[in-house]
């Protein structure tokens, strides 16, 4: 998907159209894990964000990486955001069943647990209505195409707009 059809670009359009002065800084890296997010979060904080959309973990799940390590990485990112007074919108992810039911259950439980523990605004599943829907994804059934990014943008906006009003 070209940059202007990506969800960060679409989100910027929604923000501007609603009259908010906020600027989206796309710190996402395709294929990245929560460990990569830990390495990048200090750079992100140099932009002095008011709000961080924390949407990491899907690639940890695709690779079958340790759920405990993912949780620890997300906790580190949350702590650093809090040190810089950035509010957080946490987007949940789902795991594929190929690593077994226990892994899937443990993986998916991390996101609501962290949202509750840290009192975060929470979007239960970033790709709701997109993942597994061939008309909204690349042939892998996971990565969104333009129509999928439109859905993702709307999902994020429902949680983000009230945060922008505060």
Where are these regions (language model features)?
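Alpha-helical cap/lid subdomain in secreted, periplasmic
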Residues: 9-20, 36-166
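Short, surface-exposed alpha-helical recognition segments that flank or form part
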Residues: 2, 29-32, 65, 144
């Amino acid at each position: 998907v070209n940059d202007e059809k990506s969800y960060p670009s679409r989100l910027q359009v929604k923000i501007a159209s609603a009259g908010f002065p906020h600027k989206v800084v796309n710190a996402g890296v395709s294929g990245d894990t929560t460990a990569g997010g830990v390495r990048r979060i200090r750079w992100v904080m140099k932009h002095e964000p008011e709000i961080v959309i924390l949407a990491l973990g899907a690639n940890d799940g695709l690779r079958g990486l340790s759920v405990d390590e993912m949780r620890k990485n997300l906790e580190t990112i949350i702590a650093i955001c809090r040190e810089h007074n950035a509010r957080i919108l946490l987007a949940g992810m789902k795991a594929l069943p190929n690593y077994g039911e226990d892994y899937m259950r443990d993986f998916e439980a991390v996101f609501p647990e962290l949202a509750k523990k840290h009192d975060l605004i929470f979007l239960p599943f970033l790709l709701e209505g997109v993942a597994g829907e061939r008309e909204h994804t690349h042939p892998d059934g996971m990565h969104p195409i333009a129509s999928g990014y439109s859905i993702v943008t709307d999902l994020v906006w429902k949680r983000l707009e009230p945060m922008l009003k505060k």
